[in-house]
Structures are given as structure tokens and as C-alpha cells.
Regions:
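Folded alpha-helical bundle/alpha-solenoid domain cores of large eukaryotic adaptor/scaffold proteins
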Residues: 1-293, 300
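Long, low-complexity intrinsically disordered regulatory regions
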Residues: 309-325
């Protein structure tokens, strides 16, 4: 690992203490943390009074590490600093996708009209039964529309829904354009986003703690403290903004689940968007199949009409020919 480090050993910790991000990447810093000397190793090296150049490269490196108070803690802070911007950016992007998807779904008038049509169809099919006057339906019922078939077994309720909408509300057929963030949101796991938010908060706490302790280290940590204070000034503001977005996402997710009449404690966000994404795909597929079936029927009708016209032209000719004879 040491052979991959571009910075000379005697400058390595100076780069770390100066928080020079270009000196090392995250993997290299993590490997350095593994190299941190144990108490036993430190005691052995402290007792060495010979020439440092006669030691192996690893031993020389351990002696460099020993010069820095709480070197492991500082390396972890350095690692956090290197990853901070990308971590915050990635989490912000993921949260924004969840937020946008939640708002798009709730604000889609087209999707709402489709849901109303599904309810009307369900009540019509169940007319005369206890289910014939329902005021709503469970979200997972959307996925059962492909299971209910007509007597000829060719058309499903999903096909019929698309046909009704095509006849009565054709403008809603492209509702999927209203929910552009549905598919990327379906790839998100809120549990992992929560863990990432927690990791960033804990990492920042460690930075604050190390800064407070390092201020008593003396000259060796002066640059480290100066750079860390500057980093904290912007990092704390970034994390506050991120935490605010995270809270907003939590509220929007709950509102989305309640919008469909479900319980946030029992129906997680992942289930909602997964169900809606599958419904969208099945809906689009059924609509496309309807379109192809209609084209096929129109083609057959046209061919039938063509044959009829041709036969009508042939028949008089045959009669006239017979009269001549």
C-alpha cells in the first residue's frame, strides 16, 4: 500500500494535517488507518534509539504516525473530509428524487382521473353486492386488474380500463409523463437514506470533537485546526440544509401514503412506488396491446372490404359475358 502513496513518507502526515485532499484518496486513507500502530508497537518503537534510516519502510512510517497525537482520529476526520462533498451531494440527489416523485404522484390530475375510473368500473362490476358502492380501494388492487378477464379470456380488466379511457378520457393515457421520477424513486430504500443521513451527522460530530481536542495539541496541530474550522463553517450549514430536506421528505412520503388511504406504519414508501411503477408498466403495455389489436382489426376490415369490392366488380362482368354468349 505504501508504494502507491505518491507523497514522501516525511510529508505524508503534513498533508493529512493540512487536509490536502489531493494527496490521498479515500481507500489510501482507510489503509493508513489500518496501519496505525498498536500500543505495543508504539512502546517498541519508542525504545528504538538507532538511526531511523536503518529501519524498514513500514517501521519508518509507523514512527511518522506516532508523531501525531491521536493519529487514527485525525485520519478518520481526513477521510470524512475527502468524502463529505460527494456524500452530501449523493444523498441530496436521492432525497430530491423521493421528494419529486411524492409530489408528482399527488399532483397528477391524470392519475387521479384514472383512479376514479377504476373505482367506477369496480362498482359497476360489483353492482348488487356489498362491494358495489365502495368509496375507495386498496393500492395493491391495482395489480389485480390484469388478473380479471372477460369471458373470452382475451381481454383483462386492464385492457378494458384502457379502452374506456381511450374512448372517454384520451388525454389521461400518457399520465406516466406526469410522474417522471417514479422509476428512479422505486430504486430508493428509505432505510439506507436514513443510515446515510445518520452517518453524515455522526461524522460531523467526530470532526467537532477532534477539533476541540486538537486545539490543545500545540504547534503540530495548528494548521489542522485552522483548516478544520474553515471546513466546519461550510459543512455544518450544508448538513443543516440536508437535515431540513430529509425532514421534508419524511413529511411528503407520509402524505403520499395517506393520499392513497394507506397507513404509513404498515405500507412503506417502497411498496407504494413499486406498486405504482408496476401498474404504470402494465397500463402502458395493455394500452399498446389495445392499439395493436385495433390496428389488426382495422386491417382485417379493410381487407374484407377490398375483397367484397373486388367480388362485386367481377360478378357483373361475369353476367355480361354470359349474356353475350
Amino acid at each position: 500500500m505504501l508504494s502507491k502513496v505518491k507523497v514522501p513518507l516525511h510529508d505524508l502526515m503534513s498533508s493529512v494535517l493540512a487536509l490536502e485532499e489531493s494527496a490521498l484518496d479515500t481507500d489510501q486513507v482507510e489503509n493508513l488507518i489500518k496501519f496505525c500502530p498498536t500500543k505495543e508497537e508504539m512502546e517498541l518503537l519508542k525504545g528504538y534509539n538507532g538511526e531511523k534510516e536503518k529501519l524498514g519502510r513500514c517501521e519508518q512510517f509507523l514512527m511518522e504516525l506516532m508523531k501525531v497525537p491521536r493519529v487514527e482520529s485525525k485520519l478518520r476526520v481526513f477521510s470524512f473530509r475527502i468524502q463529505f462533498n460527494s456524500q452530501v451531494s449523493d444523498l441530496r440527489n436521492s432525497l430530491s428524487v423521493v421528494n419529486s416523485a411524492s409530489e408528482e404522484i399527488r399532483n397528477s390530475v391524470k392519475l387521479k382521473r384514472i383512479m376514479q375510473t377504476i373505482l367506477s368500473l369496480g362498482n359497476a362490476l360489483n353492482q348488487g353486492t356489498a362491494k358495489g358502492s365502495a368509496i375507495g380501494f386498496r393500492l395493491d388492487s391495482l395489480l389485480k386488474l390484469t388478473e380479471t378477464r372477460a369471458r373470452d379470456k382475451k381481454m383483462t380488466l386492464m385492457h378494458y380500463l384502457c379502452k374506456v379511457l381511450d374512448d372517454q378520457l384520451p388525454d389521461v393515457l400518457d399520465f406516466s409523463k406526469d410522474v417522471a421520477n417514479l422509476e428512479p424513486a422505486a430504486k430508493m430504500q428509505l432505510k439506507f437514506l436514513a443510515e446515510e443521513m445518520q452517518a453524515i451527522n455522526k461524522g460531523l460530530e467526530k470532526v467537532v470533537q477532534e477539533l476541540s481536542t486538537s486545539e490543545n495539541d500545540g504547534p503540530i496541530s495548528e494548521t489542522f485546526c485552522k483548516k478544520l474550522k474553515k471546513f466546519l463553517g461550510s459543512a455544518e450549514a450544508d448538513v443543516r440544509s440536508l437535515a431540513s430536506l430529509y425532514s421534508s421528505v419524511g413529511r411528503n412520503v407520509d402524505q403520499l401514503i395517506l393520499y392513497f388511504g394507506e397507513d404509513p406504519a404498515r405500507c412503506p414508501f417502497e411498496q407504494v412506488v413499486s406498486t405504482l411503477l408496476n401498474f404504470t408498466r402494465m397500463f402502458n403495455k395493455a394500452h399498446e396491446e389495445n392499439r395493436k389489436q385495433l390496428e389488426l382489426e382495422m386491417k382485417k376490415t379493410a381487407e374484407s372490404e377490398k375483397k367484397k369490392c373486388e367480388s362485386e366488380r367481377i360478378l357483373p362482368t361475369a353476367i355480361r359475358t354470359g349474356n353475350v354468349k
